[in-house]
Amino acid sequence: MPFRVSRRAAALLGVACAAAATFALAAHAAPPIKVTSQTPTDGPIRYTVKVTSSRYGNAQQTRTLRSGDTDDFTWRTTPPGGPVPAVAGCPGYASLPLDANGAMVRQTQVRLAPIVAANGTANVQLSFRAQAPRGTRTVTSGGQSIKCPDVAEHTEVVRFSMPTTGAPKTVKLADGTQITISALR
């Protein structure tokens, strides 16, 4: 007996095939989805700053910054021979890093000012300033001889480019201090 299809079943089959073809064409016509793992260049970036110095000590800290922001990293540490007493008559007394007892300690300051380009490269300006006592010296103040800290200090500004992929960038300053920075989105 031959297989017969009713008109109604044939019509439904035709509608179903037409609908399936329409949906298939619509699926192929949709725009592709672009997946990217990059974040906007002005988004927060984690910067880790590590200072290695025989004179000013070692320190490390991580902070989050946006492109165009600046941040100051400041570390105070006890020098190898201990803090050096300072009195108000010492030259530059107001700018000396002092502990709670009024004795000079080591201080390292790093100001980081990154600007991230569209390609993800950070153009960084780094300002470095450090002070440390290296013993004492005798000075005359108000007609009296007083012992003051013999201050070693270094100030330097460097500019450089670095990736924001977490790869470290090391900068060597004129006094031998090394600063290693990494930036990660």
Residue ranges of predicted features:
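Bacterial N-terminal signal peptides that target proteins for export
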Residues: P2-V15
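Bacterial N-terminal signal peptides
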Residues: L13-A24
